[in-house]
Amino acid sequence: MGIRDAAYPGSFDPITFGHVNIVKRSIERFDNLYVVVVNNPNKKYLFSLQERIEMVKKDLEDIPNVIVESFDGLLVNYLKEKKIYNLIRGLRAVSDYEYELQMANANHMLFPQLEIFFLMADTDFSYISSSMIKEIASYNGDVSKWVSKFVELKLKEKLLKK
């Protein structure tokens, strides 16, 4: 843990190739990247926290210096506890920016030493979201362009078992 480490938080419900792209681009700039699977009690998830952690670990297992952890609570408390001063956020569109700017301002007020880095989504992934992928998968649509085989299988198990 230290000044050259960063955190990339998200619900990852499920993890997509867009998330993986942000991780790969982030790890080039930092010594270690903590991918933090967050658990917000006010949010409804398709996958349990343990399932989301399993998918994230599987999809990121070949990327060195990536540490997958989970946290529920205020993100800045996790960052302070770990002594992580850099936060990565991915942006797909202008609509993401408004929300992320509000969150960045709040986080900076709570943790003034925090540097927040916004990475624009690669154009190949700028239009995808976990919600969109879940909807397509729920109709047995092909999501292989956006998620790994492992995640695709987990989606089918979860959504098509009914």
UniProtKB/Swiss-Prot annotation:
Binding site for substrate: 11, 43, 75, 89
Pathway: Cofactor biosynthesis; coenzyme A biosynthesis; CoA from (R)-pantothenate: step 4/5
Positions of ATP binding: 11-12, 19, 90-92, 100, 125-131
InterPro entries cross-referenced by the UniProt entry: Cyt_trans-like, PPAT, Rossmann-like_a/b/a_fold
Sites annotated Transition state stabilizer: 19
Any Pfam family: CTP_transf_like
Superkingdom: Bacteria
GO MF, any single term: pantetheine-phosphate adenylyltransferase activity
Keyword terms, alphabetized: ATP-binding, Coenzyme A biosynthesis, Cytoplasm, Magnesium, Nucleotide-binding, Nucleotidyltransferase, Transferase
HAMAP family (UniProt xref): PPAT_bact (MF_00151)
Protein name: Phosphopantetheine adenylyltransferase
Organism encoding this protein: Petrotoga mobilis (strain DSM 10674 / SJ95)
Gene coding for it: coaD
